[in-house]
C-alpha cells in the first residue's frame, strides 16, 4: 500500500457488523449463519466488534489485551471466515486500556517503580502549575483550561487509585469508571487514557497492529483517536497539529502491515473534520448518513440527502456508511456549530430527535466540566424502530444505503428488522441506553428471520450490491423532483438503477448485465 493509497485501498464490498456473540452465542454462530445458502455472495467484509478480544467493560471497548477471547472466538473461526472470502475489520481502541490490562495492573502493583509509570496519564503531573489543588488531592485546572475540556460524562475525567505506598494518585479517565471498596480493599473498573508521549505506548501500538494483521484484518477502525493527543492549553478533543501527527505516525505503522485505517470521530459537520480527513487520504466514517436517511424518509424529500451525496462525489470522499450500529444514531454530527452551516437546520434536528424519542429511543448527551449538559450526542434505537417499525421504510432505507457511494456496513439487528429492546435497556440501568439495540439472536431467531420478507428482501439487495460489477463503475444522481430519488451506477454495459418514490416509499431496482435485464420491485 502506498502512502497515497489509503482511500483507494478501502474495499468496495458490503460489510456485516456484529459482536462475536450476537448470533447464536459466539463467533462460530455467525460463521454458521454466513455459511447458509441465503448468505452466499452477500458479504465481503465483517466488522467484528472488540469483545472478540479480552475486555471487561463497554461490551469490548475496555480492552485488557488483544488476544482472542476464547469464550467467544477462535483461530478456526477466523480461518472459516477467510475461506468464505470475507475480509475482516477490527477495532484498535487508541485512547485507552482497561484498568484490568497488564500495564495498569503493573502500575497498581509497583507504583512509582512500575515500568509502565508513564504509560498512562498522571492527572496532577499533567496539570502541574496550571490550576489549584482540590481538598481530595487532585488538581482542578484553571478556568481557561476547563473551558477547553470536552467531556463524555459529568465531572472531571479522573480515576483516583491507591499506590502500594498508600498514596492516592489521579489518572486521566475520559470514559467509564467505577471504584468499589470490599472488606477494606479497593477494586477498580475503568478505561484509562494512554499517554501518547510514552515510547512504550507506541511499541504497544505497533505490536497490536501486527497482531491484528495476523488475525486477517484488512481495515482497522481507530476508536476514540480524537481524544488521544493532549496538551496543556489545547482542547482534549481533536487538537491540531498534534492529532494529525499521531495519525500520520499510526499510518506509517499500518501501511507496513497492509492495513487500511478508518479514523472514528464524531464531530459537527460545520467543523469540516471530515474534509480534512479525506484531503489527507483517509476514509471517512459517515456518521451523517443515518440521520439524513431518516430525514429523507420522514419528510419525503431528497433535498438534504442529495446535498451530502453531491459533496461525497465532488470532494472524492471515500466513506463507510451505515444505518444502525452498536452505538446510537448520531445527531451532533449533523449540526453546523459555530463555524458553519449544518447538513440539517438545528430545528429540524430537534424535531427529528423528538420523533425518535416518541418511537421509543433514548438520548445520550455530552457534558461540560461542571457537569451540565452542553449538547445532545446521539439517540439510541434500532434503525427499524427509528423508522416507526415499518418494513417498507426499512427496505427503502437499505436500498438507499446500498446505492449511495461508500462501503455499506450492515448492523446485524437491522438486517433482521429488530425492534427496540426497552427491557434490556432498563435492566442495564442508568448507563444502559445502548442495550436497546444490542439484542443477541439465537439460531432459532435467525431461522425465523429468514422466513420474513423484509429480511429476504434486504439480502437480495445486499447480494446485488456485493456482487455486481456496476458498483465498481461510475455513479450519477439522475435529476428528479425532490420526492423521488434515482441513483445510477454503470460499469461498461452493466447498469444498476434505484428509482425510489420517497412519498409512497415504493421503489424498483433495475439491473442490466450480460444482455439481461432484471427488475426488482418493492412496494
UniProtKB/Swiss-Prot annotation:
Record bears the keyword Glycosyltransferase: yes
Broadest EC class assigned to this enzyme: transferase
EC number of this enzyme: 2.4.1.329
Temperature impact on function: Optimum temperature is 35 degrees Celsius.
Listed Gene3D superfamilies: Glycosidases, Oligo-1,6-glucosidase, Domain 2
Outcome reported for the amino acid change (mutating residue 377 to H): 50-fold decrease in catalytic activity in the synthesis direction, but only slight decrease in affinity for beta-D-fructose 6-phosphate
MF GO annotations: glycosyltransferase activity
Annotated binding of sucrose 6(F)-phosphate, by residue: 58, 96, 221-223, 264, 326-327, 434
Reactions catalysed, as given in the entry: sucrose 6(F)-phosphate + phosphate = beta-D-fructose 6-phosphate + alpha-D-glucose 1-phosphate
Domain of life: Bacteria
Keywords: Carbohydrate metabolism, Glycosyltransferase, Transferase
Site feature location: Transition state stabilizer: 327
Matching InterPro entries: Glycoside_hydrolase_SF (IPR017853), O16G_dom_2 (IPR045857)
Quaternary state and interactors: Monomer.
Its job: Catalyzes the reversible phosphorolysis of sucrose 6(F)-phosphate into alpha-D-glucose 1-phosphate (Glc1P) and D-fructose 6-phosphate. May be involved in a new pathway for the degradation of sucrose, which could become phosphorylated on its fructose moiety during uptake via a PTS system. Shows strict specificity since it does not catalyze reactions with alternative substrates.
Protein name: Sucrose 6(F)-phosphate phosphorylase
Lineage: Bacteria, Bacillati, Actinomycetota, Acidimicrobiia, Acidimicrobiales
Amino acid at each position: 500500500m502506498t502512502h497515497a493509497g489509503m482511500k483507494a485501498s478501502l474495499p468496495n464490498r458490503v460489510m456485516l457488523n456484529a459482536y462475536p456473540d450476537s448470533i447464536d452465542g459466539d463467533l462460530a454462530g455467525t460463521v454458521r449463519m454466513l455459511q447458509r445458502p441465503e448468505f452466499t455472495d452477500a458479504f465481503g467484509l465483517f466488522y467484528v466488534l472488540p469483545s472478540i478480544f479480552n475486555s471487561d467493560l463497554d461490551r469490548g471497548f475496555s480492552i485488557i489485551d488483544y488476544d482472542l477471547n476464547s469464550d467467544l472466538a477462535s483461530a478456526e473461526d477466523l480461518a472459516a471466515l477467510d475461506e468464505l472470502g470475507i475480509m475482516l475489520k477490527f477495532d484498535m481502541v487508541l485512547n485507552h486500556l482497561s484498568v484490568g490490562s497488564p500495564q495498569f495492573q503493573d502500575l497498581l502493583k509497583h507504583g512509582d517503580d512500575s515500568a509502565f509509570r508513564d504509560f498512562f496519564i498522571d492527572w496532577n503531573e499533567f496539570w502541574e502549575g496550571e490550576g489549584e489543588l482540590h481538598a481530595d488531592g487532585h488538581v482542578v485546572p484553571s478556568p481557561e483550561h476547563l473551558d477547553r475540556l470536552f467531556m463524555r460524562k459529568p465531572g472531571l475525567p479522573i480515576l483516583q487509585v491507591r499506590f502500594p505506598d498508600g498514596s492516592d494518585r489521579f489518572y486521566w479517565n475520559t470514559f467509564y469508571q467505577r471504584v468499589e471498596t470490599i472488606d477494606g480493599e479497593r477494586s477498580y473498573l475503568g478505561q484509562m487514557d494512554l499517554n501518547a508521549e510514552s515510547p512504550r505506548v507506541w511499541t504497544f501500538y505497533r505490536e497490536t497492529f501486527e497482531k491484528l494483521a495476523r488475525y486477517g484484518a484488512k481495515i482497522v477502525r481507530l476508536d476514540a483517536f480524537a481524544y488521544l493527543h493532549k496538551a496543556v492549553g489545547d482542547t482534549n478533543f481533536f487538537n491540531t497539529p498534534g492529532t494529525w501527527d499521531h495519525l500520520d505516525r499510526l499510518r506509517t505503522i499500518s501501511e507496513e502491515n497492509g492495513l487500511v485505517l478508518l479514523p472514528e470521530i464524531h464531530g459537527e459537520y460545520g467543523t469540516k473534520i471530515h474534509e480534512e480527513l479525506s484531503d489527507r487520504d483517509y476514509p471517512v466514517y459517515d456518521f451523517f448518513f443515518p440521520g439524513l436517511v431518516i430525514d429523507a424518509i420522514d419528510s419525503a424529500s431528497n433535498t438534504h440527502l442529495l446535498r451530502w451525496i453531491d459533496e461525497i462525489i465532488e470532494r472524492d470522499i471515500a466513506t463507510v456508511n451505515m444505518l444502525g450500529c452498536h452505538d446510537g444514531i448520531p445527531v451532533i454530527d449533523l449540526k453546523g456549530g459555530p463555524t458553519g452551516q449544518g447538513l440539517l437546520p438545528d430545528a429540524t434536528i430537534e424535531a427529528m430527535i423528538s420523533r425518535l424519542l416518541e418511537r421509543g429511543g433514548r438520548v445520550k448527551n455530552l457534558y461540560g466540566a461542571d457537569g451540565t449538559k452542553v449538547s445532545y450526542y446521539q439517540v439510541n434505537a434500532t434503525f427499524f424502530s427509528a423508522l416507526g417499525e415499518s418494513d417498507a421504510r426499512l427496505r427503502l432505507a437499505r436500498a438507499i444505503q446500498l446505492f449511495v457511494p461508500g462501503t455499506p456496513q450492515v448492523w446485524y439487528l437491522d438486517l433482521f428488522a429488530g425492534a427496540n429492546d426497552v427491557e434490556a435497556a432498563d435492566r442495564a440501568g442508568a448507563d444502559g441506553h445502548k442495550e436497546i439495540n444490542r439484542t443477541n439472536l439465537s439460531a432459532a431467531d435467525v431461522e425465523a428471520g429468514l422466513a420474513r420478507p423484509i429480511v429476504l428482501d434486504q439480502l437480495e439487495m445486499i447480494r446485488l450490491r456485493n456482487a455486481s460489477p456496476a458498483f465498481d463503475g461510475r455513479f450519477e444522481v439522475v435529476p428528479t423532483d425532490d420526492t423521488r430519488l434515482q441513483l445510477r451506477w454503470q460499469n461498461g454495459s452493466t447498469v444498476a438503477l434505484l428509482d425510489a418514490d420517497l412519498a409512497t416509499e415504493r421503489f424498483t431496482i433495475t439491473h442490466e448485465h450480460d444482455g439481461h435485464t432484471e427488475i426488482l420491485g418493492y412496494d
